[in-house]
Swiss-Prot record:
Gene3D superfamilies: EF-hand (1.10.238.10)
PROSITE patterns, sorted: EF_HAND_1 (PS00018), EF_HAND_2 (PS50222)
Organism: Caenorhabditis elegans
Name this protein carries in UniProt: Neuronal calcium sensor 2
Amino-acid positions noted as binding Ca(2+) 2 in the UniProt annotation, renumbered to this chain: D111, D113, N115, T117, E122
Binding residues for Ca(2+) 3: D158, N160, D162, E164, E169
PANTHER family found in the cross-reference section: CALCIUM BINDING PROTEINS (PTHR23055), NEURONAL CALCIUM SENSOR 2 (PTHR23055:SF69)
Note: Probably binds two or three calcium ions.
InterPro entries: EF-hand-dom_pair (IPR011992), EF_Hand_1_Ca_BS (IPR018247), EF_hand_dom (IPR002048), Recoverin (IPR028846)
């Protein structure tokens, strides 16, 4: 029973876990936590809050579809909320993770049904969501439709032609093709 209106505290266990499993210092973790609790006083982020934040970054498009996939990937315990630990682990991977870590994270997002592989339908759904989020300023010519883009990706990556991408095929394919890596991880050239 806490004091009414009191904000959740960062536990020592979570702090130690995040120090060991992220590239953030203790001070940075505490600073991130302070901002997180300020924005999410209940100590977790709902899907609705998450979508609202994403919409602010992509005002000309429809971010809801893509947000569903990103939210699912952040929410590793499938609680329907993103707690601070899940949030900071995802921020760490997406902002300062190795290429392999970023690709593993992207793979989990693309693997919509969670079966450990990505099929062409899953790839198309993600590409459609990305196009919707980016909005009308991104020209979607017939040559660059989600279906054609997915087919091109599978032609390059599906080594054994079983119509599914394993994590290894996905990572190896992206590491071998810088353009695909940038597209599939939303990585921008620095």
């Amino acid at each position: 029973m806490g004091i009414k209106g009191s904000k959740p505290k960062l536990s020592k266990e979570d702090l130690e876990f995040l120090k060991k499993n992220t590239n953030f210092t203790e001070e940075q973790i505490k600073e991130w936590y302070k901002g997180f609790v300020q924005d999410c006083p209940k100590g977790h982020l709902t899907k609705e809050q998450f979508i609202k934040v994403y919409k602010d970054f992509f005002p000309s498009g429809s971010a809801e579809g893509f947000c569903e996939h990103v939210f699912r990937t952040f929410d590793t315990d499938n609680s329907g909320f993103i707690d601070f630990k899940e949030f900071l682990l995802a921020i760490n991977v997406t902002s300062s993770g190795t290429p392999e870590q970023k690709l593993e994270w992207a793979f989990r997002m693309y693997d919509i049904d969670g079966n450990g592989t990505i099929d062409e339908k899953e790839m198309i759904k993600i590409i459609e969501a990305i196009y919707e989020m980016l909005g009308p300023e991104v020209t979607k010519s017939a040559d660059d439709s989600p279906r054609k883009r997915a087919k091109m990706i599978f032609e390059k990556m599906d080594v054994n032609n079983d119509k599914e991408l394993t994590l290894k095929e996905f990572v190896d394919g992206c590491l071998a093709d810088k353009e695909l890596f940038q597209i599939l991880t939303n990585e921008v050239k620095k």
